[in-house]
Amino acid sequence: VATIIVTKPAEAGAALADALRAAGATVLFLPAFEIEGAADPVAARGVLAQLAGFDLALFVSPAAVRATRVLLPGNMIWPAGTRIAVVGAGTALAARAALPIASAAAVIAPDGEAAVEALGSEALWAVLRTLQPPPRRVLILRAAQGREWLGERLRENGAEVHTLAVYRRTTRAWTHYADAADIAAALRAGATIVVTSSEAAAVVLDNMVALRAAGAEDWPEPTLIATHPRVAANLRDAGFATVHTLPTLDAQAVLQAGR
């Protein structure tokens, strides 16, 4: 089996890399981003102090949940009128683990297969659009940069939408995490690369271009595994021909797709 390059960041990416190694794979963990705290924590805390003024707090990722918890006072009581919305099962689990102060709040999440994190904004919107009464003041908790699609749908539905950057994604070259020769050897042997966001797809392309330029060599076409059709489309648009879509990043499924 070819080397698997995992670009999913933070704890979830490290956990996937560990699971793949436990299943016998050779893995390079090259996270597309590192997660850092809010650029202006004082300003962020000021917004969070007004949570009671929002009828919906929307978390876009587990990282958003964890970063928000760091910013909230330890003795805070979650406002009873502020519901919580999450994009998938992973974010819902993070909310229950990191926000015990919000245990009494209503948590809105996609059900069934749509609860898979990678299905993201569209799956959550299918639930939010049916809420009665519809949310009127929404706070989206996210990274400094992110997809605007869900906020746009909420505004079209009459909501006043605010976004708060509770964390930052910092990009580092793959060579920050592994030796360039090891990465090039994996690519030369036909690596499988796991990509979990459109932003990560751009990082993968940038790193491959940089490595090719530095080594003055080319490699066979890698196999790409995307977690969302939108990510897969971005990868194909970038020129990658072999792209599989796996909404659930199960280690065995990744191994099978990479064969």
Where on the chain are the PLM-derived regions?
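Conserved beta-alpha
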Residues: 1-259
